[in-house]
Amino acid sequence: MMHFPEYQTRIYEEVRSNVGLKRRISPEDKDVCPITNAILLETHRMASVGALSLPHKTTVDTSAGGFTIPKDTMVFVNLYSIHYDPTHWDEPEKFKPERWLNADGSLKKEKPTHYLPFSAGTRVCIAERMAKMQLFIITTNFFRNFEVSNAPGEELPGLKDGIYWSTLNPPRRKIVVTKRKHN
């Protein structure tokens, strides 16, 4: 979010307008914060915790993408690759939360089948709903009260910095967290 102070401001303004600055943010507030939800969806697309799906095992000889996959082969889906595939996403290298919004600013109800930050099918993350709600509450509370920026003299990190093995391991950063002055 250091790259996008305008989105930090948009989260703040949305929360200020639709929830307020005093009361505790609740799960029900998710419905009145489409911009925040779109920002979280785009963040999940670009920086999923897991780069690969959990393992799957083929039960029959099959093929995919022109490759033969014998029965009993362990298969991992490259979720990172899917989230950056230009055949699925317009300008996948760009942070574009607007891709998740309708023309009227409401959040799109249907998510594309190639959006898989929590995997899919029988191996989908069992805590997906809880994780999304916690991330919403943490994000809205944080940006309602603070702004985050790069530390002076520090190079702004790249959007794809970090090491992916089975999970994302972002590098350490020096940041500045500034308390907002509420008007």
Predicted regions and their residues:
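Conserved cytochrome P450 K-helix/beta-meander segment immediately N-terminal to the heme-binding cysteine loop
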Residues: 61, 77-106
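Cytochrome P450 heme-thiolate "Cys pocket" and heme-binding signature region
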Residues: 65, 102-135, 161-163
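C-terminal helix/juxtamembrane-tail motif
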Residues: 73-74, 80, 164-183
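Conserved beta-strand elements of beta-rich interaction domains across eukaryotes
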Residues: 74, 81-83, 122-123, 137, ...
